[in-house]
Structure formats: structure tokens, C-alpha cells
């Protein structure tokens, strides 16, 4: 059985489409855990309506704890063998669960990843996550190869595996799934990537990803980078290489966010930027010489990376 956790907060415009895409699965053995995170619109009533009309749906009503708190609440209540986290303004393809079960049985892995498309507010596709490779990989090797580690909704996890890691979503921050996914992959799970698109991100004007980047976004990604810098590094070449790649990718992410800020916020953020770069440089032996120079010249390395992307 699958447990599908859907954090819900003030999404009355989008919730019907999201849940209906789940209930329309051709595979029927699943539960939907709708976590109403203190919504102030009609979302709580909509959740209750789904629970009354379909026995596969159940609702958790809780005071607002943020996205991490909602996901953690759903995770605690999940009874399924497999767990998915679906954002309440997005949709999934009708054959997702069926395909996941077939491949979990075939490959006996801990995690299965899949592709997504991003639709704008008019429903037009503006981005695809690209092609995943249909093969089994170790989590450490995936990070070693610099294969992009996607956000939480693009993976299905074995419940037993997640319980053993004791990793949960960190409360009170943006980009909490960035930290969660990095921590999960550093436990070296067996991962299979499906080269198919099953997830549909729907951008909306008021969402975090489309609103003006604010100071808190940047401070949170700096906090995540700092937490990863304190991660215990095992004396193993593959692990060290993967760890350094993760540090590199999140330094670059912090630089990308920094560049998206207003000039006024950049001035405020310079202190945090300097603290992060100093933390990296102080851990030169752990993070490697390349990350040391990235911390010394973040703008230069970011520009080079963007040029290389365009050439490709």
C-alpha cells in the first residue's frame, strides 16, 4: 500500500484538482493523508468532504506548523509500505502508483525517482526536469556523478527505509526539502530512476517559488549550507567526494538566490554571505580545495557555471 501525504494550507483553488488526480489512480491500494496546516480558507472543509466521500482519504487538522511540520505529521501517520509527498497545488499522472509498485518489486530499492514538468499559471509547460536514467544507483554514487538531486515530491520512499534513517523535515525554513534530500542521499540508499514524467508542478502567483525572493529565503539556504558543513564525514573516498559535491551544489544555490534578491536585500545579506564563505574556508580540509576557491570567488564560479550550461 502507498501512503500519499498532502500538506494543505490555503489552497482552496487548487486542492480539488490535486486530490482528484490522486483518487484517479488506476492502482487502488493507497491512503491519502490530507494535513490541514491551520488553513483559513475553505481548505479544511474540502479536506473533510473528500474524507467523507472516499474511505481512502483521511484528514489531520493541526495549528499552522509550516510545510515541514505538515509533512512530518503526515509521515508519522503513514501506514503504507511506500510514501509519497505531493504538494497540494500539483497533480500526478494516473499510472504513477502502478508503475512505482512494478518497479519496487522488480528492483527492490529504497527510493524511486521520476521526472516532472512545470506548468505556468496558464497551464502551459515552461520547464521539464529532464531525463532520468532507468537504472539502479547508490545514493552516494548519484551525488558523486553530480546527477541533480530533485525535490521531495519527485521521489517515492520505502516507509521502512525512512524510519531507519530517523531523518525528518526541519521546521521553520524554506528549502527544507533541499536539506532533507541531501541528508537522505548521504545515507547511501538504493535508488532507481524512472525515465518517465509523472508529476506536474503548477506554479501560482502567491507560491514561494514565484514570489519575490526575500531575505528569509537566503538566510535559510545559508543555514542549510552551514548545517551540511557540520555533517559528520566518514573516512571514505566515495563519501567524501559526494559530500564535497553536495557542498558545491548548495553554495551555488545560495549564490543563485543571492543574485535574485533586490539590491537592498543583497546589502543586508552580505553579512550572511560572508559568514557562509568563511565557514567553508575554515573547513578547507573537509570540503576540498575546489570548494575553498568557490567560497573565495562565488560570483566567478557561478558565472562560469552558467556559461557552461548555455554552451551545452
Please report, for each region that a protein language model flagged, where it lies by residue:
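Short aromatic/hydrophobic "clamp" motif used to bind/position activated sugar donors
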Residues: 83
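Glycine-rich, basic loop-to-helix element that forms the pyrophosphate-binding segment
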Residues: 62-78
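Catalytic core of nucleotide-sugar-dependent glycosyltransferases
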Residues: 198-204, 211-237, 253-280
Amino acid at each position: 500500500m502507498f501512503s500519499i501525504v498532502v500538506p494543505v494550507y490555503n489552497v482552496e483553488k487548487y486542492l480539488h484538482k490535486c486530490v482528484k488526480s490522486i483518487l484517479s489512480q488506476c492502482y487502488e491500494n493507497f491512503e491519502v493523508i490530507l494535513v490541514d496546516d491551520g488553513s483559513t480558507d475553505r481548505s479544511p472543509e474540502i479536506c473533510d468532504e473528500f474524507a467523507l466521500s472516499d474511505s481512502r482519504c483521511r484528514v489531520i487538522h493541526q495549528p499552522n506548523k509550516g510545510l515541514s511540520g505538515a509533512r512530518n505529521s503526515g509521515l508519522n501517520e503513514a501506514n503504507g509500505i511506500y510514501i509519497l509527498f505531493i504538494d497540494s497545488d500539483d497533480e500526478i499522472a494516473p499510472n504513477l502508483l502502478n508503475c512505482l509498485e512494478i518497479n519496487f518489486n522488480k528492483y527492490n530499492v529504497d527510493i524511486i525517482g521520476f521526472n516532472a514538468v512545470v506548468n505556468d499559471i496558464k497551464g502551459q509547460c515552461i520547464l521539464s526536469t529532464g531525463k532520468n536514467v532507468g537504472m539502479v544507483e547508490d545514493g552516494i554514487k548519484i551525488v558523486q556523478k553530480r546527477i541533480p538531486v530533485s525535490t521531495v515530491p519527485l521521489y517515492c520512499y520505502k516507509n521502512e527505509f525512512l524510519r531507519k534513517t530517523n531523518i525528518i523535515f526541519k521546521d521553520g525554513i524554506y528549502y527544507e526539502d533541499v536539506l532533507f534530500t541531501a541528508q537522505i542521499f548521504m545515507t547511501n540508499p538504493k535508488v532507481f530512476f524512472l525515465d518517465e514524467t509523472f508529476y506536474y508542478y503548477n506554479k501560482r502567483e502567491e507560491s514561494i517559488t514565484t514570489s519575490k525572493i526575500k531575505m528569509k529565503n537566503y538566510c535559510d539556504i545559508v543555514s542549510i549550507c552551514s548545517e551540511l558543513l557540520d555533517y559528520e564525514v566518514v573516512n571514505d573516498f566515495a563519501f567524501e567526494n559526494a559530500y564535497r559535491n553536495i557542498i558545491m551544489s548548495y553554495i551555488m544555490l545560495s549564490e543563485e538566490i543571492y543574485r535574485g534578491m533586490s539590491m537592498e536585500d543583497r546589502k543586508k545579506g552580505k553579512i550572511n554571505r560572508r559568514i557562509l564563505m568563511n565557514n567553508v574556508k575554515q573547513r578547507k580540509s573537509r570540503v576540498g580545495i575546489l570548494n575553498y576557491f568557490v567560497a573565495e570567488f562565488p560570483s566567478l564560479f557561478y558565472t562560469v557555471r552558467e556559461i557552461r550550461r548555455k554552451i551545452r
